[in-house]
Amino acid sequence: MKLSLQTLVAAVAVAAFSTTAFAGADVEGAKALTKANNCMKCHGIDKDKDGPSFKKTAAKYKGKADAESKLVTHLTTGPKVKLEDGSEEEHKMVKTKDMAQIKNLVAYILEQ
């Protein structure tokens, strides 16, 4: 089988970009942000607390094109959320304006 130079270059480019695109979240950065914002008080990684686990949230948004934007909005606008006891409260907004940090946290949640 004979490969052209164009085919070879295209294959290398696809491999390089897909590795970058799917490199995943900076786990330590995301964990630091969850700690600074006390996220784990209400959310567990794989167990529900007052709020859904990160794993449950990831399953809810799996395969949805708007997952990142919906979660970014949720973390930055303080919407009303319903707790297990039926009461409602405002979800705390993440304490950073750095969109890269917020998107990293969302990527971390969606990877669970």
Task: Tell me the role of every PLM-derived stretch.
Residues 1-28, 112:
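N-terminal export/targeting leaders of redox proteins
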Residues 64-74:
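Post-signal/leader-peptide non-cytosolic segments of secretory proteins
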Residues 37-45, 105:
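The canonical Cys-X-X-Cys-His
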Residues 19-34, 60-64:
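Electrostatic cytochrome c docking/interface patches
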Residues 43, 76, 109-110:
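Protein kinase-like catalytic domain
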Residues 50-61, 74-106:
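Axial heme c-ligation environment in periplasmic c-type cytochrome domains
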